[in-house]
């Protein structure tokens, strides 16, 4: 997988920053200028160039056939800033679209009303504040290429202690006077208030990237929320409550000082050290320790399409014979991620059909010589994706998927 990210000013085409990820070389300036030139040319004709896909044949020495290298290009123009995203081997165009939205959001967290700025002022402001948003952009790119996180969804941790931790969080929320609070454990959200889940998914993701891209878990910074509040800043405060856990709150300037918020956080979680430690032990797996998953399952994705929550993990409970079938955690996660992209694209196509007799996708599966994948959806918008070893009979995958789906969701203590 390779991704280029080019940020330019719309008026002058001057580069603000350039980022790349994967096995790719730096783009020459002439290529950057050509990509921007395509966008400007179509814009002069009143045509908005949004996306295109190209493929080229790479010759292989002493071999007649050649493998096609397919690239997808995305152009986005917003508030005097042009973003060009180029991706190869990314799985789906939707990933690049989501990536572009998040990058614009990262810039918008610190720079507002960019369209009202003069060209020279805008460029100076973008350069000056780059140290604030570029680390977030790098974290977004890392998440897109690593294949261990779903962009467009909030990464969650399902621990058996979540119900008790949520009670402490609601107590803290009442004391600090904010409806927007969450507890982050190991870079994932364990529990959050209803107000936090009411935030747009993009706002939630960006705040999590802001926290996880920093070298410290303690913050008190003003931020704009691209969807909820693009022109009025909130205070984003994060307070460490354990070695790998932080309490996050969105509040206004009139709310309590950081010292008072810190005191409220310590009061709420003073006697909950054992609960936090138990939740942190779930981090590699993201599931309750006592929950047993069939040893023939290699990896799991669980999402809710309405709340945009997600869980993406590998199964650690496997026999030695199973572990030899597919080597490498990233390889098995990448296989399931590709199946996830294909399935969600199919769901989207079914839902956008103009026919009155729409088809609802409930189950889907795929088989290969080395593994099998299965997806199961319920009426509440929960979808589970499983990667099985190839030895599992195809007719048994539906039963196993439904059983694992029920075992996870019937655990009320995880607060899904």
UniProtKB/Swiss-Prot annotation:
Pfam families linked to this entry: Fuz_longin_1, Fuz_longin_2, Fuz_longin_3
Gene Ontology cellular-component annotations: cytoplasm; cytoskeleton; plasma membrane
Signal sequence coordinates: none
Single Gene Ontology BP annotation: non-motile cilium assembly
Domain of life, source organism: Eukaryota
Keywords attached to this entry: Cytoplasm, Cytoskeleton
Tissue distribution of the protein: Expressed in female, but not male.
Subcellular location, principal: cytoplasm
Intracellular or extracellular location(s): Cytoplasm; Cytoplasm, Cytoskeleton
Functional description taken from the UniProt entry: Plays a role in the organization of cell polarity via a planar cell polarity (PCP) cascade. Involved in the development of the hairs on the wings. Specify the correct orientation of the hair by limiting the site of prehair initiation to the distal vertex of the wing cells. Controls wing cell hair number by maintaining the integrity of the cytoskeletal components that direct hair development.
Protein family: Belongs to the fuzzy family.
Name of this protein: Protein fuzzy
Native organism: Drosophila melanogaster (Fruit fly)
């Amino acid at each position: 997988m390779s991704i280029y990210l080019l940020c330019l000013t719309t008026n002058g085409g001057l580069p603000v920053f350039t980022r790349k990820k994967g096995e790719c070389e730096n783009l020459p300036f002439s290529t950057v200028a050509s990509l921007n030139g395509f966008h400007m040319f179509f814009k002069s004709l009143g045509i908005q160039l949004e996306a295109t896909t190209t493929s080229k044949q790479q010759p292989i020495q002493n071999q007649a056939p050649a493998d096609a290298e397919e690239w997808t290009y995305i152009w986005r123009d917003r508030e005097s800033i042009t973003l060009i995203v180029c991706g190869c081997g990314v799985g789906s165009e939707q990933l690049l679209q989501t990536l572009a939205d998040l990058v614009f959001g990262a810039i918008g967290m610190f720079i507002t009303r960019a369209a009202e700025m003069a060209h020279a002022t805008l460029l100076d402001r973008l350069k000056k504040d780059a140290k604030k948003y570029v680390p977030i952009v790098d974290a977004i790119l890392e998440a897109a290429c690593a294949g261990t996180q779903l962009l467009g969804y909030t990464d969650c941790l399902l621990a058996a202690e979540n119900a008790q931790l949520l009670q402490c969080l609601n107590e803290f929320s009442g004391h600090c006077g904010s409806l927007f609070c969450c507890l982050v454990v190991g870079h994932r959200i364990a529990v959050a208030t209803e107000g936090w889940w009411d935030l747009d998914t993009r706002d939630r993701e960006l705040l999590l990237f802001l926290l996880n891209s920093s070298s410290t878990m303690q913050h008190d910074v003003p931020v704009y929320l691209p969807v909820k509040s693009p022109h009025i800043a909130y205070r984003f405060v994060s307070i460490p409550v354990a070695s790998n856990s932080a309490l996050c709150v969105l509040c206004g300037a009139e709310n309590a000082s950081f010292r008072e918020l810190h005191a409220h956080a310590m009061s709420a979680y003073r006697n909950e050290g054992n609960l936090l430690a138990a939740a942190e032990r779930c981090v590699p797996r993201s599931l309750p320790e006592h929950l047993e998953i069939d040893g023939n399952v290699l990896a799991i994705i669980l999402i809710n399409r309405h709340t945009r929550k997600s869980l993406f993990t590998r199964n650690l409970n496997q026999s030695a014979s199973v572990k030899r079938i597919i080597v490498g955690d990233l390889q098995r996660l990448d296989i399931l991620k590709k199946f996830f992209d294909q399935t969600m694209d199919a769901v989207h196509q079914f839902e956008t059909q103009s026919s009155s007799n729409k088809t609802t996708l409930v189950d889907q599966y795929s088989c290969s010589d080395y593994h099998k994948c299965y997806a199961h959806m319920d009426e509440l918008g929960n979808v589970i994706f499983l990667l099985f070893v190839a030895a599992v009979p195809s007719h048994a995958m539906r039963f196993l998927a439904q059983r694992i789906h029920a075992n996870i969701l019937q655990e009320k203590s995880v607060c899904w």
